[in-house]
Amino acid sequence: MTKPTDTDHPTESPVGFAANPAAMSDPLNLVRARAAIDEASVKTASTSLVEYRSSGNCLVIANGSDADAIDQALQCVAAMSDLSSWILCPGNTAEQPRPPRELTEQGVVIFHRQLLKLQGHLGQFDVQVAALGENPSAEHLGVIATTETGLFDLVLDLGGTATIDVQLPPFGYIHADNPDAVENACAQLSEMVGEFQKPKYFDYQQTLCAHSRSQLNGCSNCLDVCATGAISSITDGIEVDPFLCQGCGHCATVCPSGAMTYAYPSPATAIDSSRDLLNSESQAVLGIFLYPVTDEEEAGDAGDTVDALLPDHVLSIAAEETGAFGIDYWASMIAAGVRKICVLQHASDDAQSTVAGPGDLALVEQASMLNQILHALGLPENMIEILPSLNDTVLAGLTEKYQCESADHPLAGIPAASFSLHNDKRATLRAAIDHLRDHLPDNAVKHIDLPDGSPFGRLSIDNQGCTLCMACVSTCPAGALLDGQSVPQLRFIEANCLQCGLCSEACPENVLDREPRYLFDSVDARQAQILNEEEPFNCIVCHKPFATRKMIDNMSGKLSEHWMFQESKALRRLKMCEDCRVKDIFTESESGIDVHQKPKQPS
């Protein structure tokens, strides 16, 4: 079986502010030729391309095994005459038993097998069906159908329920459950033959990821919002399938550490390009309207509609995925002097396409969190507003949303920030907020409490229960928890804390609790604070400090009833360092301790 490769073709890609016309005119936002990407006029940082290869081997999954379902599937095969098609009827009842495989007069092979699993993407769909006989194993239908790779390139699912049930199904798979959808699906699949390319939309740094450490579970934000099922959990991190990823960008927006970043365009490119657009306008830009487009024609139509309704001081920016622009981008624009940002999630007002998914809801939560931080600085409420769709109500109220021209506005007279922090999400956000705090008069606020799930905060600790075992330090992925090096201390840097919860999971004493908040003073936030410290315990022989007194006392108390520590000399060894303990054992007896021999019990 041949697997398409994630090729490392560097390309200067345009998506973000002027969507690629060639990519958007393609049936599934895929590009057939590299040249189509290189022609773009708006440049961003290099990214790689993901390649798909389709030979046109299509599997049609019928809606049952009765005559009507088979007839519908055969009509689809006829409509896709340019493809090599097979039909799978997953229902084969005892009342109407059918042979496992039959050939129609038109030469179409129909399989009557139980469908167990369907996974993959354009050019590589693996279809597993139940094996014949009493053996409950699975067989690969592509191998039975003798396709070249043992896989199917395309799948048309006519069943009542989608076999691949995700918000954004993979390229090459279409679920159609009504006549119009079936007709459109046949037309689209017929065009999906050949080689296709799309950008690799993401960059992932495992070392920054707070998903898991040492088989402990922490942050799962990206998994919770992924609309394609492209993200999966692995040991000490996550894994993203670039062939399933469709670039919605929500994973990067909700990532607390910046381990997941959007690459098409990168955050730094998006911020710099937006600043250039702000500076290129003949008059001051006080508002931004960020809206999604899927093709060049739609971009023009939507832009004309929006621009006709927006005041002159508002800049409309077209983006292929508005969900990829998160709190670091919004805060940077506010620091650049923008007084209102509206983000449109869906270009269409169609009820089915505007159903709020986990990513849409997460975007609203991110905006709400940043609005709380900005309002605490004395700025107006709801400076960032998420709009679900461009319906009549939204259109009618656009002008009112951007009534921010007042000379008394808190941002009036504040210089525009122009920092660049090279895709460091947390540093970018803090730099933007620091800039606002330095120039706003109402900057006496020390901190603001945030809702659960926020990526900023501190830790509270039960000092009486903490033994300074440092399990939390070894687990923290962000360097927020530190040991005292030569002294028994637990230190904490609030600016680094992701509130991922890995430290709480690792703590054997359950003494750590998270307190989400934003600390405005960056000096204090970056200063290491002592959470707990104990008196060091010195070895009773060599006097070297090797533990804390509390740890030795706890250990002595817990082991005092154990049969191996019934003699005073055994308990005494607990108060020795590792070197002196070994010396003492072999000094006392040449044979050492027989750990298998229990002392005699008193009669």
Segments predicted by a language model, with ranges:
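Non-catalytic interaction/regulatory modules that flank or connect domains
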Residues: 314, 321-335
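A contiguous, basic/glycine-rich beta-loop/short-helix subdomain that forms a polymer-engagement track
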Residues: 262-282
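Iron-sulfur cluster-binding cysteine motifs and their immediate structural context
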Residues: 202, 217-241, 246, 250-268, ...
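Cofactor-cradling patches in redox/metallo enzymes
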Residues: 128, 329-386
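Short hydrophobic alpha-helical runs that function as membrane-insertion/retention elements
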Residues: 84-87, 317-318, 340-345
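Helix-enriched interaction subdomains in cytosolic or periplasmic regions
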Residues: 1-37, 232-269
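Short helix-loop-beta junction
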Residues: 77-81, 303-315
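Ferredoxin-type iron-sulfur electron-transfer modules and their immediate structural context
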Residues: 2-224, 283-298, 375, 381-482, ...
